[in-house]
Amino acid sequence: MAKDKDVRPIIKLKSTAGTGYTYVTRKNRRNDPDRMVLKKYDPKIRQHVEFREER
């Protein structure tokens, strides 16, 4: 059973390019308490852009 405050929650990373493309990943809440920002590939515009954590 999952706890309410899971140590490794599943998060969605949404493209800042406005295409609506998302990645789904997990993060360690103890090491990264802030919102995650990663530079990943957006296939809709064929470029690497920033993806921000969505809640």
Curated annotation (Swiss-Prot):
Name of the gene: rpmG
Entry similarity comment: Belongs to the bacterial ribosomal protein bL33 family.
HAMAP family: Ribosomal_bL33
Name of the protein this chain belongs to: Large ribosomal subunit protein bL33
Taxonomy of the source species: Bacteria, Bacillati, Actinomycetota, Actinomycetes, Micrococcales
Record Gene3D superfamilies: Ribosomal protein L33
Annotated GO CC locations: cytosolic large ribosomal subunit
Source organism of the structure: Pseudarthrobacter chlorophenolicus (strain ATCC 700700 / DSM 12829 / CIP 107037 / JCM 12360 / KCTC 9906 / NCIMB 13794 / A6)
GO terms under biological process: translation
GO MF annotations in UniProt: structural constituent of ribosome
UniProt keyword annotation of Translocase present: no
InterPro entries: Ribosomal_bL33 (IPR001705), Ribosomal_bL33_CS (IPR018264), Ribosomal_bL33_sf (IPR038584), Ribosomal_zn-bd (IPR011332)
Keyword terms, alphabetized: Ribonucleoprotein, Ribosomal protein
Claim: Ribosomal protein is one of the keywords in the record: yes
Pfam families in the cross-refs: Ribosomal_L33 (PF00471)
Transmembrane annotation, as ranges: none
